[in-house]
């Protein structure tokens, strides 16, 4: 298609996105990622919309470990893993992840999007079935689409609907249940104990994406397997190094050895993407050492979550129930969520409004993400701003 035809087409499409209020503008941050940041022309704000759950994105111990890894192992690998892109650091990190999740083996990816996108196709054929939660992350949805297996979708965390799908899929050779550990828009946790019970009843594998739950959910923050004590009953975990685990980039799949071995042979994002850079691998190894030494960051995070949620509920806000670090402040109206977020930034609080098509129509909200990097004064300032803006816009009295 020539530029003469294609350019007007894209221009019209972009105009439609803007008219619908769905155009995404990127606000520029000029400081390291942490609780207090500067945006645009030096405006100082408190950040309540990062995935920086354990506050490690600017941790000096991790920064030093990254520098040390570059000194000892270089800047980049210039190769995929199976050619000449595997260093001792990569194998050490895979072992550390396996130890953390109590699994047999682990495979690293450039991102969790790649881990999920490259998971199903190597393991399943058109004789098999994938049963996926309706609110799963886009990366799981795309991974399912790339696979020839028959697809079933059950209502979010609805065990009766999951059982219906499992019954319908009994004619298929193999079945796998796919779910997020924490659903990113509502902050609710998948009921893994019940999911595992149904998997055992109907002879299905279980896969869970721990991206928003690892480091956060569970008595010591080890994720949904710890929360529901289902170690050994979940076959596959996927996750990211880009949220609680330091916030850089990189993803992984961890689970049974034969599954991981098959992914090394046939998972296309693994086979055809560069290895994770040594600096990220070295810092991630140090991060897992830190989490072994102490769970103080997790304790602080959950204290912050409880404090913020309780104060917001007392002020009259509608907050979705949560066991995670995600607090969804429900506003329901799309324009209201945009106006609310803009006014919050004027008060020095950086939050984002989410609305259709990211969430269902009539379910607009501000998604607040708490961090161990937040101090009590940060929380109090954010709560005061929510109350002020909430009263101005008629959300609370």
For the regions a language model picked out, list residue spans one by one:
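N-terminal "arm"/small-domain region of PLP-dependent enzymes with the aminotransferase-like
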Residues: 11-73, 204
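Active-site phosphate-binding strand-loop segment of PLP-dependent enzymes
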Residues: 52, 152, 156-208
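PLP-dependent enzyme catalytic core of the Aspartate aminotransferase-like
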Residues: 60, 64-68, 72, 95, ...
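Short loop-beta-helix segment that forms the pyridoxal 5′-phosphate
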Residues: 80-86, 94-118
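Conserved PLP-anchoring active-site segment centered on the Schiff-base-forming lysine
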Residues: 119-138
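Active-site C-terminal subdomain of aminotransferase-like
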Residues: 202-205, 212, 217-323, 336
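Conserved PLP-binding catalytic core of the aspartate aminotransferase-like
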Residues: 299-348, 358, 362-363, 370-372
């Amino acid at each position: 298609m020539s530029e003469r035809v294609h350019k007007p087409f894209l221009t019209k499409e972009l105009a439609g996105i803007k008219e619908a209020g769905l155009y995404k503008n990127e606000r520029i941050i000029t400081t390291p990622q942490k609780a207090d940041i500067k945006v645009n022309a030096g405006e100082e704000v408190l950040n309540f919309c990062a995935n920086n759950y354990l506050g490690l994105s600017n941790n000096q111990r991790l920064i030093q470990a990254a520098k040390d890894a570059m000194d000892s192992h270089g800047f980049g690998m210039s190769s995929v893993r199976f050619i000449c892109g595997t260093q001792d650091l990569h194998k050490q990190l895979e072992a550390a992840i396996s130890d953390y999740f109590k699994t047999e083996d682990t495979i690293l990816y450039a991102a969790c999007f790649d881990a999920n996108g490259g998971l199903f196709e190597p393991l399943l054929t058109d004789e098999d079935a994938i049963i996926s939660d309706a609110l799963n992350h886009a990366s799981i949805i795309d991974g399912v689409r790339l696979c020839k297996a028959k697809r079933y979708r059950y209502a979010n965390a609805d065990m009766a609907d999951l059982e219906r799908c499992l019954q319908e899929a009994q004619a298929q050779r193999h079945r796998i249940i796919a779910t997020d550990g924490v659903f990113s828009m509502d902050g609710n946790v998948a009921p893994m104990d019940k999911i595992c019970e149904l998997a055992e009843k109907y002879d299905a594998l279980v896969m869970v994406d721990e991206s928003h739950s690892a480091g956060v959910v569970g008595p010591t923050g080890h994720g949904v397997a710890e929360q529901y004590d289902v170690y050994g009953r979940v076959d596959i975990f996927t996750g990211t190094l880009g949220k609680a685990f330091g916030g850089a980039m990189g993803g992984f799949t961890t689970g049974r050895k034969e599954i991981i071995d098959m992914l090394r042979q046939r998972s296309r994002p693994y086979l055809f993407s560069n290895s994770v850079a040594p600096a990220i691998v070295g810092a991630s190894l140090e991060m897992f050492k830190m989490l072994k030494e102490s769970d103080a960051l997790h304790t602080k995070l959950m204290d912050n979550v409880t404090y913020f949620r309780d104060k917001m509920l007392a002020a009259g806000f509608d907050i979705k129930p949560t066991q995670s670090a995600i607090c969804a402040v429900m506003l329901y109206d799309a324009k209201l969520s945009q106006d609310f977020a803009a006014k919050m930034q004027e008060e020095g609080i950086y939050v984002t409004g989410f609305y259709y098509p990211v969430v269902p129509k009539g379910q607009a909200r501000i998604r607040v993400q708490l961090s161990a990097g937040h101090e009590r004064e940060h929380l109090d300032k954010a709560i005061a701003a929510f109350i002020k803006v909430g009263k101005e816009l008629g959300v609370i009295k």
